[in-house]
From Swiss-Prot:
It comes from Bacillus subtilis (strain 168). This is L-aspartate oxidase. Pathway: Cofactor biosynthesis; NAD(+) biosynthesis; iminoaspartate from L-aspartate (oxidase route): step 1/1. One of its GO terms (biological process) is 'de novo' NAD biosynthetic process from L-aspartate. Its cofactor is FAD. GO terms for cellular component: cytoplasm. It is an enzyme of class 1 (oxidoreductase). The keyword Endoplasmic reticulum does not apply. FAD binds at residues 11-14, 33, 40-47, 151-152, 205, 353, 369-370.
Length: 531
């Protein structure tokens, strides 16, 4: 029997979790745009959330996830992932993954925004993502191919099925890589905005490639802005993990006033969307916002990554304060997938931030993303292993009649427009203005043979921006990370409804899998928003 071939686009935690789950008999190729360590996962300062403590439970973790997600989560997916995630964390512990431990040898469990218990597993203080990638790279078998400096240029579709991927290397050479199954694990689209936490290679490629191939994209209006990026003189230097607030740090203005004290019952540990809006409001008044970490005695030991970021930015760590501002962090929406990571295109999977499974709802709970990456990576691999080998009689060769529409703008112009019109606060006239601008940009059609990687990335970002803006315009309510100043409350009429895009058009669809609890929608969500 011929070997089953798998092509994986991306090299973050989801991609490597998937690759590590295949036995040596599978022909797995991991393709990444730059170095294998160019991914958002490497930058993850938070940890992995799992209900491990004796007084904690999966039910409590589920409730926190639903509360943060503002009643837009797929309940079955949440329950599944949290159950499997706890077992995966247990497996990491048994295999000696270097989670932080106390002087007695017990695992240190941290607390982050919107969690009701200490359940965050960290490694290396604030270097969990980097250490997880190192660990997964050691776990994958030697027969797996890791191809660096090669970019996915198009998905190969034959008779409605994905049968491989066309790639372009750093020298501009095109290649065709046929596969029984293709897995998109290329991250989100943080580079659409001026201030973001993403690797520079994360430009919406997976979203746009899936859309071009005919797959469904869902929930693109739900873009999470992390409350605390270190921003100095308009320059963003990196993320300041909310674990700092979990350890006793607090948000203050230049006069030392605690800005979250009366804004939410959880104070500085309110859900990310809430904290981002409060900081945005303070900055709009002309107030500077800081994290005061003076109460954390061992800050440099506990947060070595953040300490290095402060040094790079010229921040005196002994001042006990870090200047912060919100920035784009995570896309809750993405390519529509089922519990196995299958998209609506046969032969095509999506996992990690590229995918939208319904786990995060309208706003992701802190440290649920690495959990998602580990669970869906392993789960997608297990599903692929169970499938029969595709009867391969490939007819698609090197197709050179593929064209990209490339807008005649610079990337920073698109970032500036998205930041001013589509970030934390949104309203109809501004969204319409942005949508018109996006759809009337002059562009050129560039053949895939001639296109540069940068042009390809700009095209992906432009396509994603158009769909994202249309979603934000259509959803006339505020829910989670999507906040409309002209519709400042969650609406029961939007409960369970999703905005779905395909090449054939856009539709609003009721998803019966979304947790339907009207009291949660009408009371808890609205109480957590401010107008």
């Amino acid at each position: 029997m011929s070997k089953k071939t798998i092509a994986v686009i991306g090299s973050g935690a989801a991609a490597l979790s998937l690759a590590a789950a295949f036995p040596p008999s599978y022909e797995v190729t991991v393709i990444t745009k730059k170095s294998v360590k160019n991914s958002n996962s490497v930058y993850a300062q938070g940890g992995i959330a799992a209900a491990y403590a004796k007084d904690d439970s999966i039910e409590a973790h589920l409730e926190d996830t639903l509360y943060a997600g503002c009643g837009h989560n797929n309940l079955a997916i949440v329950a599944d992932v949290l159950h499997d995630g706890k077992m995966m964390v247990q497996s990491l512990l048994e295999r000696g993954f270097p989670f932080d431990r106390n002087e007695r040898g017990g695992v240190c469990l941290g607390r982050e925004g919107a969690h009701s218990y200490n359940r965050i597993f960290h490694a290396g203080g604030d270097a969990t993502g980097r250490l997880l990638i190192d660990y997964l790279l050691k776990r994958i078998n030697s027969k797996i191919k890791l191809i660096e400096n090669e970019t996915a240029a198009d998905l190969l579709i034959e008779d409605g099925r994905c049968i491989g991927v066309m790639t372009k290397d750093s020298k501009g050479r095109l290649k065709v890589r046929h596969a029984d199954e293709v897995v998109l694990a290329a991250g989100g689209c943080g580079n659409l905005f001026l201030h973001h936490t993403n690797d520079l290679t994360v430009t919406g490629d997976g979203l746009s490639l899936a859309y071009r191939a005919g797959a469904e994209l869902t929930d693109l209006e739900f873009t999470q802005f992390h409350p605390t990026l270190l921003v100095k003189n308009g320059v963003s230097y990196g993320l300041v993990s909310e674990a700092v607030r979990g350890e006793g740090g607090c948000l203050v203005d230049e006069n030392g006033r605690r800005i979250m004290a009366e804004r939410h019952p959880l104070g500085d540990l309110a859900p990310r969307d809430i904290v981002s809006r409060v900081i945005h409001e303070e900055m709009a008044k002309g107030n500077r916002v800081y994290i005061d970490f003076s109460a954390i005695s061992d800050f440099e030991t506990r947060f070595p990554t953040i300490t290095a970021i402060c040094e790079k930015a010229g921040i005196d760590i002994h001042s006990g304060k870090i200047p912060v501002a919100p920035g784009m962090h995570f896309l809750m929406g993405g390519v529509s997938v089922n519990r196995w990571g299958e998209t609506t295109v046969p032969g095509l999977y999506a996992i990690g931030e590229t995918a939208c499974s319904g786990l995060h709802g309208a706003n992701r709970l802190a440290s649920n993303s690495l959990l998602e990456a580990l669970v869906f990576g392993k789960r997608a691999a297990e599903h692929i292993i169970q499938k029969p080998v595709y009867n391969r009689q490939y007819q698609s060769g090197l197709e050179t009649s593929v064209f990209y529409e490339v807008p005649d703008i610079e990337g920073h112009e698109l970032q500036s427009k998205m930041t001013s019109h589509m970030s934390i606060l949104r309203e109809q006239s501004s969204l319409i203005e942005l949508s018109i601008w996006l759809h009337t940009l002059p562009f050129q059609e560039v053949n895939v043979k001639d296109i540069t990687i940068r042009q390809m990335e700009l095209s992906h970002l432009w396509q994603t921006a158009k769909l994202m803006t249309f979603s934000a315009l259509l959803r006339e309510e505020s829910r989670g990370a999507h906040f409309r100043t002209d519709f400042p409350h969650a609406e029961v009429s939007w409960q369970g409804r999703q905005i779905v895009h395909t090449k054939k058009g856009t539709k609003i669809r009721k998803n019966e899998g979304i947790w339907n609890n009207e009291s949660f929608t009408a009371e808890k969500i609205t109480e957590s928003l401010f107008s």
